[in-house]
Amino acid sequence: MKTQRIFPGIVLIGFGLYFFLEHSQIEIFPDFYSWPTLLCIVGAAFLIQAYSGNEFESILPGVILLGFGAHFHIVKNLEIWPDNIGIFILIISLGFILRARKTNTGMFHGLILLIISVLFLFYDKITTSFGLVETSTANIERFWPFALMAIGIYFLVRKK
């Protein structure tokens, strides 16, 4: 981090506001005073650092922390919000895509993760739309973890 004052300043302001509201017994929404809120505060600090300090590498951790914190709050309060791994992959892919818009690196990885997250989120609808037979669906479910690992290994060992 080039500018060392923005991130800690935002974190301290956020935590101070969090503890002030907690001690004042002001309830924003149910379960506001829990660890997902702290994730949101740190994630927001990373994003503010990224955009105001022109340190765009902080976009990815900011989106991940803010997104995960928001997810854990939303999943408790909104029944239609999906609670599966697809949401986490979607949040990570959004982080890659937003960072790629500023740094011109990582867009491919973000799009791959976006496709994987959509497959996870809409797997049931996709299989029924294509009319896949139960046995072929079972085979896909059994081998997709290996496909994900193969893609990951490819990213690790490929040379630019």
Where are these regions (language model features)?
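Alpha-helical transmembrane segments and their membrane-interface anchoring/capping motifs
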Residues: 1-160
